[in-house]
Amino acid sequence: MVVANIMTPEVVTVDPASSIGTAIALMREHGFRRLPVVKEGKLVGIVTDRDLRQATNSPLVLRERWYSDFLLEAIKVKSCMTPDPITATPATPIIDAARRLRQHKIGGLPVVAADDDRRVVGMVTITDMLDCLIHLLASEDPID
């Protein structure tokens, strides 16, 4: 089985010049914990809910609401994202993707087009892999 069988193809992305407030709003709206960061159609990074919490972990943010709102708009995604993230392609075997997640202690991989243009075509997460495992253990028929 390959990543294409279990990935989420509908990807919500964020621009590196967007505010972290925008990234937080997108994560909340769509229920995601990570967003690929895309500039001019190409993957340049990934930002997670943890990155955003760390970026706003300031005594002023916790104490002063007005300053918190200011920071959410002033701080840009590019300042807290992880550049050049570990990726997979749709043809990557699921076992290889799982090993990457485990080795790098991360929760998800952007899935990029196989032609190496860094165009994001999906996301695959630990949850996707657990769903696959549950399906395989619960049935005789593996996912196509």
What are these regions (language model features)?
Residues 1-10, 48-86, 98-102, 120, ...:
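Tandem CBS (Bateman) regulatory domains
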Residues 7, 39, 81, 113-116:
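A cytosolic small-molecule/anion-sensing beta-strand core signal
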Residues 14-31, 37-39, 87-106, 112-114, ...:
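The conserved cystathionine-beta-synthase
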Residues 34-35, 51:
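Hydrophobic alpha-helical segments, especially transmembrane helices
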Residues 38, 44, 120-121:
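Short hydrophobic beta-strand segments in globular cytosolic domains
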Residues 42-43, 54:
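Short active-site-proximal "capping" loops at secondary-structure junctions
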